[in-house]
Amino acid sequence: MIEFLIGLIAAVVGILVGYLIARKINNANYEIFLEQAKAKAKAIEFEAEGILRNSKISVQEAEFEAKKAYEDKALKLQKDYNAKFDEISKKEQTVLTEQEILKDSREELEKEKKSAQTIYDEGTSLKKTYETKVEESLKLLERVAGLTEDEAKSEILQKVEEKSRAEIAHIVRKYEEEAKKEAKRNANYILAQATTRYAGEYAAERLINVVNIKNDDLKGRIIGKDGRNIKTLEMISGVDVIIDDTPNAIILSSHNLYRRAIAVRTVELLVEDGRIQPARIEDVYKKVSEEFEAGIQEEGENIVMDLGLTKIHPEIVKLIGKLKFRASYGQNALIHSLEVAHLAGIIAAETGGDENLARRAGILHDIGKALTHEFEGSHVDLGAEICKRYKENPVVINAIYAHHGHEEPTSVESAAVCTADVLSAARPGARREVLEAFLKRVSEIENIATSKEGVKQAYAINAGREIRVIANAKLVNDDEAVLLAKEIAEEIQAKVQYPGEIKVNIIRETRAVDYAK
Protein backbone atom coordinates (compact mmCIF):
# COMPACT_ATOMS: atom_id res chain seq x y z
CA MET A 1 0.00 0.00 0.00
CA ILE A 2 2.73 2.32 1.00
CA GLU A 3 4.63 1.33 -2.00
CA PHE A 4 1.54 2.01 -4.04
CA LEU A 5 1.18 5.42 -2.47
CA ILE A 6 4.86 6.12 -2.97
CA GLY A 7 4.57 5.00 -6.53
CA LEU A 8 1.46 7.11 -7.00
CA ILE A 9 3.12 10.16 -5.50
CA ALA A 10 6.19 9.55 -7.58
CA ALA A 11 4.00 9.27 -10.65
CA VAL A 12 2.15 12.48 -9.79
CA VAL A 13 5.41 14.25 -9.15
CA GLY A 14 6.79 12.93 -12.43
CA ILE A 15 3.73 14.09 -14.30
CA LEU A 16 3.93 17.50 -12.66
CA VAL A 17 7.61 17.82 -13.43
CA GLY A 18 7.00 16.73 -17.00
CA TYR A 19 4.18 19.24 -17.35
CA LEU A 20 6.36 22.03 -16.05
CA ILE A 21 9.20 21.04 -18.35
CA ALA A 22 6.84 20.86 -21.32
CA ARG A 23 5.30 24.22 -20.46
CA LYS A 24 8.70 25.84 -20.30
CA ILE A 25 9.65 24.38 -23.63
CA ASN A 26 6.40 25.69 -25.12
CA ASN A 27 7.02 29.19 -23.76
CA ALA A 28 10.47 29.26 -25.33
CA ASN A 29 9.08 28.26 -28.71
CA TYR A 30 6.36 30.94 -28.48
CA GLU A 31 8.91 33.71 -27.97
CA ILE A 32 10.91 32.43 -30.89
CA PHE A 33 7.79 32.37 -33.03
CA LEU A 34 6.90 35.90 -31.86
CA GLU A 35 10.31 37.26 -32.77
CA GLN A 36 10.12 35.59 -36.13
CA ALA A 37 6.66 37.08 -36.70
CA LYS A 38 7.90 40.54 -35.82
CA ALA A 39 10.85 40.16 -38.15
CA LYS A 40 8.54 39.05 -40.97
CA ALA A 41 6.20 41.97 -40.25
CA LYS A 42 9.09 44.41 -40.44
CA ALA A 43 10.25 42.85 -43.67
CA ILE A 44 6.75 43.13 -45.11
CA GLU A 45 6.48 46.79 -43.92
CA PHE A 46 9.86 47.66 -45.48
CA GLU A 47 8.85 45.99 -48.70
CA ALA A 48 5.53 47.91 -48.66
CA GLU A 49 7.35 51.20 -48.12
CA GLY A 50 9.63 50.41 -51.04
CA ILE A 51 6.63 49.63 -53.21
CA LEU A 52 4.98 52.92 -52.08
CA ARG A 53 8.11 54.91 -52.88
CA ASN A 54 8.37 53.31 -56.25
CA SER A 55 4.70 54.07 -56.86
CA LYS A 56 5.17 57.77 -55.94
CA ILE A 57 8.18 58.04 -58.21
CA SER A 58 6.22 56.41 -61.00
CA VAL A 59 3.28 58.81 -60.43
CA GLN A 60 5.59 61.87 -60.43
CA GLU A 61 7.29 60.65 -63.59
CA ALA A 62 3.89 60.12 -65.16
CA GLU A 63 2.72 63.62 -64.09
CA PHE A 64 5.92 65.20 -65.43
CA GLU A 65 5.55 63.36 -68.72
CA ALA A 66 1.89 64.38 -68.95
CA LYS A 67 2.66 68.05 -68.11
CA LYS A 68 5.49 68.15 -70.60
CA ALA A 69 3.30 66.61 -73.25
CA TYR A 70 0.54 69.17 -72.46
CA GLU A 71 2.96 72.11 -72.62
CA ASP A 72 4.42 70.87 -75.89
CA LYS A 73 0.93 70.51 -77.31
CA ALA A 74 -0.14 73.96 -75.98
CA LEU A 75 2.99 75.59 -77.44
CA LYS A 76 2.32 73.93 -80.77
CA LEU A 77 -1.31 75.07 -80.69
CA GLN A 78 -0.23 78.66 -79.79
CA LYS A 79 2.24 78.70 -82.68
CA ASP A 80 -0.43 77.39 -85.01
CA TYR A 81 -2.89 80.04 -83.68
CA ASN A 82 -0.36 82.86 -84.14
CA ALA A 83 0.42 81.70 -87.62
CA LYS A 84 -3.28 81.55 -88.49
CA PHE A 85 -3.89 84.98 -86.87
CA ASP A 86 -1.03 86.56 -88.84
CA GLU A 87 -2.33 84.99 -91.99
CA ILE A 88 -5.88 86.26 -91.32
CA SER A 89 -4.55 89.77 -90.42
CA LYS A 90 -2.63 89.92 -93.67
CA LYS A 91 -5.69 88.83 -95.60
CA GLU A 92 -7.82 91.38 -93.71
CA GLN A 93 -5.33 94.17 -94.47
CA THR A 94 -5.31 93.11 -98.08
CA VAL A 95 -9.10 93.23 -98.13
CA LEU A 96 -9.11 96.72 -96.53
CA THR A 97 -6.57 97.95 -99.05
CA GLU A 98 -8.64 96.55 -101.87
CA GLN A 99 -11.76 98.19 -100.36
CA GLU A 100 -9.98 101.57 -100.24
CA ILE A 101 -8.86 101.16 -103.83
CA LEU A 102 -12.39 100.16 -104.77
CA LYS A 103 -13.81 103.16 -102.87
CA ASP A 104 -11.38 105.56 -104.60
CA SER A 105 -12.22 104.00 -107.94
CA ARG A 106 -15.92 104.34 -107.19
CA GLU A 107 -15.49 108.02 -106.24
CA GLU A 108 -13.49 108.67 -109.40
CA LEU A 109 -16.19 106.92 -111.36
CA GLU A 110 -18.88 109.05 -109.69
CA LYS A 111 -16.91 112.23 -110.47
CA GLU A 112 -16.47 111.20 -114.07
CA LYS A 113 -20.15 110.31 -114.20
CA LYS A 114 -21.14 113.72 -112.79
CA SER A 115 -18.71 115.46 -115.16
CA ALA A 116 -20.15 113.53 -118.07
CA GLN A 117 -23.67 114.40 -116.91
CA THR A 118 -22.71 118.08 -116.62
CA ILE A 119 -21.23 118.07 -120.11
CA TYR A 120 -24.32 116.30 -121.36
CA ASP A 121 -26.61 118.84 -119.63
CA GLU A 122 -24.60 121.74 -121.02
CA GLY A 123 -24.76 120.22 -124.48
CA THR A 124 -28.50 119.71 -124.10
CA SER A 125 -28.92 123.30 -122.90
CA LEU A 126 -26.85 124.64 -125.79
CA LYS A 127 -28.86 122.55 -128.17
CA LYS A 128 -32.13 123.91 -126.74
CA THR A 129 -30.76 127.46 -126.86
CA TYR A 130 -29.71 126.95 -130.46
CA GLU A 131 -33.11 125.55 -131.35
CA THR A 132 -34.82 128.45 -129.53
CA LYS A 133 -32.68 130.99 -131.40
CA VAL A 134 -33.44 129.28 -134.68
CA GLU A 135 -37.16 129.36 -133.89
CA GLU A 136 -36.95 133.04 -132.86
CA SER A 137 -35.07 133.87 -136.07
CA LEU A 138 -37.64 132.01 -138.14
CA LYS A 139 -40.48 133.76 -136.32
CA LEU A 140 -38.73 137.13 -136.75
CA LEU A 141 -38.31 136.52 -140.47
CA GLU A 142 -41.94 135.49 -140.71
CA ARG A 143 -43.02 138.56 -138.73
CA VAL A 144 -40.84 140.97 -140.75
CA ALA A 145 -42.15 139.52 -143.94
CA GLY A 146 -45.70 140.17 -142.78
CA LEU A 147 -45.18 143.58 -140.99
CA THR A 148 -46.98 146.73 -142.01
CA GLU A 149 -45.19 150.09 -142.20
CA ASP A 150 -46.41 151.18 -138.74
CA GLU A 151 -45.43 147.85 -137.23
CA ALA A 152 -41.94 148.14 -138.71
CA LYS A 153 -41.59 151.67 -137.30
CA SER A 154 -42.68 150.46 -133.87
CA GLU A 155 -40.12 147.66 -134.00
CA ILE A 156 -37.37 150.12 -134.90
CA LEU A 157 -38.40 152.56 -132.16
CA GLN A 158 -38.32 149.77 -129.58
CA LYS A 159 -34.75 148.84 -130.56
CA VAL A 160 -33.74 152.53 -130.44
CA GLU A 161 -35.33 152.91 -126.97
CA GLU A 162 -33.41 149.93 -125.59
CA LYS A 163 -30.17 151.37 -126.91
CA SER A 164 -31.02 154.81 -125.51
CA ARG A 165 -31.60 153.38 -122.03
CA ALA A 166 -28.01 152.15 -121.88
CA GLU A 167 -26.75 155.58 -122.95
CA ILE A 168 -29.01 157.29 -120.36
CA ALA A 169 -27.66 155.01 -117.59
CA HIS A 170 -24.13 156.01 -118.57
CA ILE A 171 -25.09 159.71 -118.45
CA VAL A 172 -26.76 159.28 -115.04
CA ARG A 173 -23.62 157.66 -113.59
CA LYS A 174 -21.54 160.50 -114.98
CA TYR A 175 -23.74 163.17 -113.38
CA GLU A 176 -23.86 161.24 -110.09
CA GLU A 177 -20.07 161.32 -109.90
CA GLU A 178 -20.08 165.04 -110.70
CA ALA A 179 -22.78 165.60 -108.05
CA LYS A 180 -20.69 163.77 -105.43
CA LYS A 181 -17.67 165.91 -106.25
CA GLU A 182 -19.81 169.04 -106.05
CA ALA A 183 -21.30 167.87 -102.72
CA LYS A 184 -17.82 167.31 -101.33
CA ARG A 185 -16.77 170.81 -102.44
CA ASN A 186 -19.89 172.27 -100.81
CA ALA A 187 -19.29 170.29 -97.61
CA ASN A 188 -15.72 171.55 -97.40
CA TYR A 189 -16.99 175.09 -98.00
CA ILE A 190 -19.59 174.74 -95.22
CA LEU A 191 -16.98 173.37 -92.79
CA ALA A 192 -14.62 176.20 -93.69
CA GLN A 193 -17.41 178.72 -93.14
CA ALA A 194 -18.30 177.19 -89.78
CA THR A 195 -14.75 177.06 -88.46
CA THR A 196 -13.89 180.58 -89.61
CA ARG A 197 -17.12 182.15 -88.32
CA TYR A 198 -16.64 180.74 -84.81
CA ALA A 199 -13.53 181.16 -82.69
CA GLY A 200 -14.10 180.11 -79.08
CA GLU A 201 -11.80 180.64 -76.14
CA TYR A 202 -10.08 177.49 -75.01
CA ALA A 203 -7.43 176.40 -72.54
CA ALA A 204 -6.67 172.81 -71.65
CA GLU A 205 -7.69 171.77 -68.15
CA ARG A 206 -4.95 171.12 -65.61
CA LEU A 207 -4.87 168.90 -62.55
CA ILE A 208 -3.70 171.64 -60.16
CA ASN A 209 -4.65 175.12 -59.03
CA VAL A 210 -2.36 177.61 -57.30
CA VAL A 211 -3.67 179.85 -54.50
CA ASN A 212 -1.51 182.91 -53.93
CA ILE A 213 -0.95 184.02 -50.32
CA LYS A 214 0.55 187.20 -48.87
CA ASN A 215 3.45 185.56 -47.08
CA ASP A 216 4.81 182.14 -46.21
CA ASP A 217 3.77 182.51 -42.55
CA LEU A 218 0.25 181.57 -43.60
CA LYS A 219 1.50 178.12 -44.69
CA GLY A 220 2.09 177.14 -41.08
CA ARG A 221 -1.36 178.31 -40.07
CA ILE A 222 -2.94 176.34 -42.91
CA ILE A 223 -1.05 173.23 -41.81
CA GLY A 224 -2.10 173.79 -38.19
CA LYS A 225 -0.96 172.11 -35.00
CA ASP A 226 0.06 168.52 -35.73
CA GLY A 227 -1.31 169.03 -39.26
CA ARG A 228 -4.94 169.17 -38.07
CA ASN A 229 -6.02 172.00 -40.38
CA ILE A 230 -4.58 170.54 -43.57
CA LYS A 231 -5.91 167.06 -42.69
CA THR A 232 -9.40 168.48 -42.12
CA LEU A 233 -9.29 170.37 -45.42
CA GLU A 234 -8.10 167.33 -47.37
CA MET A 235 -10.63 165.03 -45.71
CA ILE A 236 -13.76 167.12 -46.36
CA SER A 237 -12.74 168.30 -49.85
CA GLY A 238 -11.02 165.21 -51.26
CA VAL A 239 -8.27 167.43 -52.67
CA ASP A 240 -4.49 167.19 -52.24
CA VAL A 241 -3.14 170.29 -50.48
CA ILE A 242 0.53 170.65 -51.41
CA ILE A 243 2.62 173.07 -49.36
CA ASP A 244 6.23 173.13 -50.51
CA ASP A 245 9.05 175.63 -51.01
CA THR A 246 7.17 177.56 -53.70
CA PRO A 247 7.10 181.13 -52.33
CA ASN A 248 3.72 182.68 -51.50
CA ALA A 249 1.77 179.81 -53.07
CA ILE A 250 -0.32 176.81 -52.04
CA ILE A 251 -1.02 174.10 -54.64
CA LEU A 252 -4.31 172.20 -54.75
CA SER A 253 -4.40 169.01 -56.84
CA SER A 254 -7.35 166.78 -57.82
CA HIS A 255 -8.71 165.09 -60.94
CA ASN A 256 -12.21 166.30 -60.01
CA LEU A 257 -12.60 169.90 -61.22
CA TYR A 258 -15.68 170.55 -59.08
CA ARG A 259 -14.06 169.45 -55.81
CA ARG A 260 -10.91 171.37 -56.68
CA ALA A 261 -12.81 174.57 -57.46
CA ILE A 262 -14.65 174.41 -54.11
CA ALA A 263 -11.37 173.75 -52.27
CA VAL A 264 -9.65 176.68 -54.01
CA ARG A 265 -12.43 179.08 -53.04
CA THR A 266 -12.42 177.71 -49.46
CA VAL A 267 -8.67 178.29 -49.07
CA GLU A 268 -8.98 181.80 -50.53
CA LEU A 269 -11.69 182.72 -48.01
CA LEU A 270 -9.76 181.20 -45.09
CA VAL A 271 -6.59 183.07 -46.03
CA GLU A 272 -8.55 186.29 -46.47
CA ASP A 273 -10.35 185.88 -43.12
CA GLY A 274 -7.30 184.71 -41.17
CA ARG A 275 -9.22 182.38 -38.84
CA ILE A 276 -7.99 178.91 -39.76
CA GLN A 277 -9.07 175.99 -37.57
CA PRO A 278 -10.90 172.68 -38.24
CA ALA A 279 -14.38 173.90 -37.26
CA ARG A 280 -13.95 177.10 -39.28
CA ILE A 281 -12.69 175.12 -42.28
CA GLU A 282 -15.81 172.93 -42.21
CA ASP A 283 -18.14 175.94 -41.96
CA VAL A 284 -16.46 177.77 -44.84
CA TYR A 285 -16.40 174.63 -47.00
CA LYS A 286 -20.11 174.04 -46.43
CA LYS A 287 -20.93 177.66 -47.30
CA VAL A 288 -18.81 177.57 -50.46
CA SER A 289 -20.42 174.26 -51.53
CA GLU A 290 -23.88 175.83 -51.28
CA GLU A 291 -22.71 178.86 -53.26
CA PHE A 292 -21.32 176.61 -55.99
CA GLU A 293 -24.59 174.68 -56.22
CA ALA A 294 -26.42 177.94 -56.79
CA GLY A 295 -23.70 179.15 -59.15
CA ILE A 296 -24.05 176.02 -61.29
CA GLN A 297 -27.73 176.78 -61.90
CA GLU A 298 -26.91 180.39 -62.76
CA GLU A 299 -24.10 179.32 -65.10
CA GLY A 300 -26.47 176.99 -66.95
CA GLU A 301 -29.12 179.70 -67.30
CA ASN A 302 -26.57 182.16 -68.73
CA ILE A 303 -25.39 179.63 -71.32
CA VAL A 304 -28.96 178.82 -72.37
CA MET A 305 -29.69 182.53 -72.69
CA ASP A 306 -26.52 183.19 -74.73
CA LEU A 307 -27.47 180.42 -77.17
CA GLY A 308 -31.00 181.81 -77.53
CA LEU A 309 -32.67 178.59 -76.36
CA THR A 310 -36.00 178.32 -74.55
CA LYS A 311 -38.11 175.80 -72.63
CA ILE A 312 -35.29 173.73 -71.17
CA HIS A 313 -36.09 171.95 -67.91
CA PRO A 314 -34.31 173.42 -64.82
CA GLU A 315 -32.64 170.08 -64.03
CA ILE A 316 -31.11 169.99 -67.51
CA VAL A 317 -30.04 173.64 -67.11
CA LYS A 318 -28.28 172.66 -63.88
CA LEU A 319 -26.50 169.80 -65.64
CA ILE A 320 -25.33 172.22 -68.36
CA GLY A 321 -23.76 174.33 -65.62
CA LYS A 322 -22.11 171.21 -64.15
CA LEU A 323 -20.34 170.56 -67.45
CA LYS A 324 -18.03 173.44 -66.52
CA PHE A 325 -16.47 171.12 -63.96
CA ARG A 326 -16.07 168.09 -66.23
CA ALA A 327 -13.25 167.35 -68.65
CA SER A 328 -12.66 164.76 -71.36
CA TYR A 329 -9.10 164.06 -72.48
CA GLY A 330 -8.12 167.40 -70.90
CA GLN A 331 -10.81 169.29 -72.87
CA ASN A 332 -13.39 171.12 -70.75
CA ALA A 333 -16.80 169.53 -71.38
CA LEU A 334 -18.73 172.83 -71.27
CA ILE A 335 -16.38 174.61 -73.68
CA HIS A 336 -16.51 171.58 -75.99
CA SER A 337 -20.33 171.55 -75.87
CA LEU A 338 -20.47 175.30 -76.62
CA GLU A 339 -18.16 174.80 -79.60
CA VAL A 340 -20.34 171.97 -80.88
CA ALA A 341 -23.51 174.05 -80.38
CA HIS A 342 -22.18 177.05 -82.34
CA LEU A 343 -20.61 174.95 -85.11
CA ALA A 344 -23.72 172.76 -85.44
CA GLY A 345 -25.93 175.87 -85.71
CA ILE A 346 -23.79 177.31 -88.51
CA ILE A 347 -23.65 173.99 -90.40
CA ALA A 348 -27.41 173.47 -90.07
CA ALA A 349 -28.10 177.01 -91.32
CA GLU A 350 -25.85 176.45 -94.36
CA THR A 351 -27.59 173.14 -95.20
CA GLY A 352 -31.19 174.30 -94.74
CA GLY A 353 -31.74 172.90 -91.24
CA ASP A 354 -33.10 174.44 -88.04
CA GLU A 355 -30.24 176.48 -86.54
CA ASN A 356 -31.76 176.78 -83.04
CA LEU A 357 -32.59 173.06 -82.87
CA ALA A 358 -29.04 172.21 -83.96
CA ARG A 359 -27.65 174.45 -81.19
CA ARG A 360 -29.95 172.82 -78.67
CA ALA A 361 -28.78 169.35 -79.73
CA GLY A 362 -25.16 170.53 -79.71
CA ILE A 363 -25.20 171.89 -76.15
CA LEU A 364 -26.96 168.73 -74.90
CA HIS A 365 -25.07 166.08 -76.90
CA ASP A 366 -22.61 165.43 -74.00
CA ILE A 367 -24.99 166.24 -71.12
CA GLY A 368 -24.48 162.72 -69.76
CA LYS A 369 -20.90 163.64 -68.79
CA ALA A 370 -22.35 165.75 -65.97
CA LEU A 371 -23.73 162.52 -64.44
CA THR A 372 -20.84 160.08 -64.94
CA HIS A 373 -19.36 160.78 -61.48
CA GLU A 374 -22.64 159.94 -59.72
CA PHE A 375 -24.07 157.10 -61.85
CA GLU A 376 -22.82 154.00 -63.63
CA GLY A 377 -23.02 153.80 -67.43
CA SER A 378 -21.77 155.62 -70.51
CA HIS A 379 -22.42 159.33 -70.92
CA VAL A 380 -24.41 158.56 -74.09
CA ASP A 381 -26.96 156.37 -72.29
CA LEU A 382 -27.14 158.70 -69.28
CA GLY A 383 -27.64 161.77 -71.49
CA ALA A 384 -30.33 160.11 -73.61
CA GLU A 385 -32.15 158.90 -70.49
CA ILE A 386 -32.22 162.36 -68.84
CA CYS A 387 -33.44 163.98 -72.08
CA LYS A 388 -36.18 161.38 -72.50
CA ARG A 389 -37.26 161.90 -68.88
CA TYR A 390 -37.74 165.64 -69.43
CA LYS A 391 -39.30 165.16 -72.90
CA GLU A 392 -36.62 166.77 -75.05
CA ASN A 393 -36.99 166.93 -78.84
CA PRO A 394 -36.41 163.53 -80.56
CA VAL A 395 -33.77 165.22 -82.75
CA VAL A 396 -31.75 166.01 -79.60
CA ILE A 397 -31.97 162.39 -78.41
CA ASN A 398 -30.96 161.12 -81.86
CA ALA A 399 -27.97 163.50 -81.87
CA ILE A 400 -26.86 162.15 -78.47
CA TYR A 401 -26.90 158.58 -79.77
CA ALA A 402 -25.55 159.41 -83.23
CA HIS A 403 -22.45 161.40 -82.23
CA HIS A 404 -20.89 158.15 -80.94
CA GLY A 405 -22.30 155.91 -83.68
CA HIS A 406 -25.02 154.25 -81.57
CA GLU A 407 -27.60 155.33 -84.18
CA GLU A 408 -27.62 156.82 -87.66
CA PRO A 409 -28.41 160.57 -87.87
CA THR A 410 -32.06 160.96 -88.88
CA SER A 411 -32.05 164.71 -89.56
CA VAL A 412 -29.90 167.57 -90.84
CA GLU A 413 -29.51 168.84 -87.27
CA SER A 414 -28.25 165.48 -85.95
CA ALA A 415 -25.74 165.21 -88.79
CA ALA A 416 -24.61 168.78 -88.08
CA VAL A 417 -24.00 167.90 -84.41
CA CYS A 418 -21.96 164.82 -85.38
CA THR A 419 -19.83 166.90 -87.75
CA ALA A 420 -19.36 169.68 -85.19
CA ASP A 421 -18.38 167.15 -82.51
CA VAL A 422 -15.64 165.78 -84.74
CA LEU A 423 -14.43 169.30 -85.58
CA SER A 424 -14.24 170.29 -81.90
CA ALA A 425 -12.68 167.09 -80.57
CA ALA A 426 -10.35 166.10 -83.40
CA ARG A 427 -8.51 169.34 -83.97
CA PRO A 428 -4.82 169.19 -82.97
CA GLY A 429 -4.19 169.91 -79.29
CA ALA A 430 -7.84 169.71 -78.23
CA ARG A 431 -7.47 166.53 -76.19
CA ARG A 432 -4.78 164.67 -74.29
CA GLU A 433 -5.00 160.89 -74.30
CA VAL A 434 -2.55 160.22 -71.42
CA LEU A 435 -4.37 162.59 -69.08
CA GLU A 436 -7.70 160.92 -69.83
CA ALA A 437 -6.26 157.48 -69.04
CA PHE A 438 -5.01 158.80 -65.68
CA LEU A 439 -8.37 160.39 -64.85
CA LYS A 440 -10.19 157.19 -65.76
CA ARG A 441 -7.92 155.13 -63.51
CA VAL A 442 -8.38 157.50 -60.55
CA SER A 443 -12.17 157.55 -60.99
CA GLU A 444 -12.21 153.76 -61.11
CA ILE A 445 -10.27 153.57 -57.84
CA GLU A 446 -12.74 155.95 -56.15
CA ASN A 447 -15.72 153.98 -57.49
CA ILE A 448 -14.33 150.72 -56.06
CA ALA A 449 -14.05 152.31 -52.61
CA THR A 450 -17.49 153.99 -52.63
CA SER A 451 -19.17 150.74 -53.72
CA LYS A 452 -18.35 149.12 -50.35
CA GLU A 453 -20.93 149.05 -47.58
CA GLY A 454 -20.29 151.56 -44.80
CA VAL A 455 -18.26 153.99 -46.97
CA LYS A 456 -19.49 157.59 -47.02
CA GLN A 457 -16.88 159.19 -49.28
CA ALA A 458 -13.65 158.27 -51.03
CA TYR A 459 -10.99 160.54 -52.52
CA ALA A 460 -7.94 159.58 -54.56
CA ILE A 461 -4.99 161.81 -53.67
CA ASN A 462 -1.24 162.01 -54.29
CA ALA A 463 -1.67 161.51 -58.05
CA GLY A 464 -3.69 158.36 -57.47
CA ARG A 465 -1.10 156.73 -55.21
CA GLU A 466 -3.38 156.94 -52.15
CA ILE A 467 -7.12 156.48 -51.65
CA ARG A 468 -8.61 158.16 -48.59
CA VAL A 469 -11.85 156.45 -47.51
CA ILE A 470 -14.26 158.10 -45.04
CA ALA A 471 -16.13 155.30 -43.22
CA ASN A 472 -19.43 155.57 -41.36
CA ALA A 473 -18.57 155.06 -37.68
CA LYS A 474 -22.02 153.59 -36.97
CA LEU A 475 -21.68 150.88 -39.62
CA VAL A 476 -17.95 150.11 -39.44
CA ASN A 477 -16.02 149.40 -36.23
CA ASP A 478 -12.23 149.38 -35.79
CA ASP A 479 -11.83 145.69 -36.64
CA GLU A 480 -14.08 145.98 -39.69
CA ALA A 481 -12.09 149.03 -40.86
CA VAL A 482 -8.98 146.83 -41.15
CA LEU A 483 -10.91 144.25 -43.17
CA LEU A 484 -12.46 147.00 -45.32
CA ALA A 485 -9.02 148.40 -46.19
CA LYS A 486 -7.80 144.91 -47.16
CA GLU A 487 -10.92 144.25 -49.25
CA ILE A 488 -10.59 147.55 -51.15
CA ALA A 489 -6.86 146.99 -51.73
CA GLU A 490 -7.47 143.47 -53.11
CA GLU A 491 -10.20 144.67 -55.49
CA ILE A 492 -8.04 147.57 -56.75
CA GLN A 493 -5.18 145.13 -57.31
CA ALA A 494 -7.48 142.78 -59.26
CA LYS A 495 -9.29 145.34 -61.43
CA VAL A 496 -7.01 148.39 -61.93
CA GLN A 497 -3.70 148.57 -63.76
CA TYR A 498 -1.33 151.05 -62.12
CA PRO A 499 2.40 151.61 -61.62
CA GLY A 500 3.89 151.19 -58.14
CA GLU A 501 1.51 150.76 -55.20
CA ILE A 502 -1.66 152.42 -53.89
CA LYS A 503 -2.15 153.15 -50.19
CA VAL A 504 -5.68 152.54 -48.86
CA ASN A 505 -6.33 154.81 -45.87
CA ILE A 506 -9.56 154.20 -43.89
CA ILE A 507 -10.67 157.16 -41.71
CA ARG A 508 -13.31 156.47 -39.05
CA GLU A 509 -14.34 159.38 -36.86
CA THR A 510 -16.96 159.62 -34.10
CA ARG A 511 -18.27 163.02 -32.97
CA ALA A 512 -20.43 163.78 -29.94
CA VAL A 513 -22.12 167.20 -29.79
CA ASP A 514 -24.16 168.75 -26.99
CA TYR A 515 -25.08 172.26 -25.91
CA ALA A 516 -24.82 173.99 -22.51
CA LYS A 517 -27.86 176.16 -21.79
Swiss-Prot record:
One family from Pfam that matches here is KH_1
Q: What are the recorded GO MF terms, alphabetically?
A: RNA binding; RNA endonuclease activity
Disulfide cross-links:
none
A Gene Ontology biological process term: mRNA catabolic process
* The KH domain, residue ranges: 207-271
Location (main, coarse) = membrane
Subcellular location per UniProt equals: Cell membrane
Cited SUPFAM superfamilies: Eukaryotic type KH-domain (KH-domain type I), HD-domain/PDEase-like
Q: Where is the HD domain?
A: 333-426
Q: Which InterPro entries match?
A: HD/PDEase_dom, HD_domain, HDIG_dom, KH_dom, KH_dom_type_1, KH_dom_type_1_sf, Ribonuclease_Y, RNase_Y_N
User: Which residues are listed as membrane-spanning?
Assistant: 1-21
- The reply on keyword Lyase is no
Protein's recorded name:
Ribonuclease Y
The protein's organism comes out as Campylobacter hominis (strain ATCC BAA-381 / DSM 21671 / CCUG 45161 / LMG 19568 / NCTC 13146 / CH001A)
